[in-house]
Amino acid sequence: MFKGVYPAIITPFKNKEVDFDGLEENINFLIENGVSGIVAVGTTGESPTLSHEEHKKVIEKVVDVVNGRVQVIAGAGSNCTEEAIELSVFAEDVGADAVLSITPYYNKPTQEGLRKHFGKVAESINLPIVLYNVPSRTAVNLEPKTVKLLAEEYSNISAVKEANPNLSQVSELIHDAKITVLSGNDELTLPIIALGGKGVISVVANIVPKEFVEMVNYALEGDFEKAREIHYKLFPLMKAMFIETNPIPVKTALNMMGRPAGELRLPLCEMSEEHKKILENVLKDLGLI
């Protein structure tokens, strides 16, 4: 069901409020450039600093703007199981195609706790669920054996966004758990596709969707020579997206390009002048500004 490039979109702000017109403009730009779907209110969408009301309004707006043209994956994770259920049910009710559900962060559940958490979410909705593993942010690693148990027990647990850079774990996940894997790290998209992954939930695709779609399509077709050419062309941009905490660099880049992005919400803050210069040079080298 999941294949290709899914930009994890930013949430643009204007005068400290969500810029819904800018959001619509960004979504249309991404769809026009061939993405497979839109991932709303994930980490890149500054979900931690959106109110519940804003979170829900953004999902509703994304579903409305997309209007069935591509898939909508709604961020619906939480470190509180009941809250994750509430957000997932809401996403289903307003017409999202799937939910992205992160491993609970900070409270560090065991593997059994993760199994029970995701099981409760899966029981609450009929939508496909994309599990999200990002140990660098959550302090917990969703192990392949846990994913295998979940996928065997719940038919709507359909995919994993894997942002653990350990390719040995990715291999186990694809081979043993037999579940669709989407890269959660732009730099590792090609290695993960080579192992059998089906695509990427991407930050960089906010900036260069057409090129990223071309790269992934070449890789999925087995033409890794052409895919590598694009990978290495975009590699400096991939690196630049993480010179400060995501989504600081991607929003800064979009602002430099004159695209809707706006300010960040504290505790995220404006990029340092030193890093701005690095990012500006990368964008200039690619002809983006």
Swiss-Prot record:
Compartmental location: Cytoplasm
Keyword Lyase on entry: yes
Site (Part of a proton relay during catalysis): T43, Y106
Active site (record annotation): Y132, K161
Catalytic EC class: lyase
A biological process term (GO) from this entry: diaminopimelate biosynthetic process
Binding residues for pyruvate: T44, I201
Enzyme Commission (EC) number: 4.3.3.7
Keywords tagged on the record: Amino-acid biosynthesis, Cytoplasm, Diaminopimelate biosynthesis, Lyase, Lysine biosynthesis, Schiff base
Annotated metabolic or biological route of this protein: Amino-acid biosynthesis; L-lysine biosynthesis via DAP pathway; (S)-tetrahydrodipicolinate from L-aspartate: step 3/4
GO CC, one annotated term: cytoplasm
Pfam family, one: DHDPS
Organism domain of life: Archaea
Entry function: Catalyzes the condensation of (S)-aspartate-beta-semialdehyde [(S)-ASA] and pyruvate to 4-hydroxy-tetrahydrodipicolinate (HTPA).
Record HAMAP family: DapA
Assembly with partners or alone: Homotetramer; dimer of dimers.
NCBIfam families: dapA
Protein name according to UniProt: 4-hydroxy-tetrahydrodipicolinate synthase
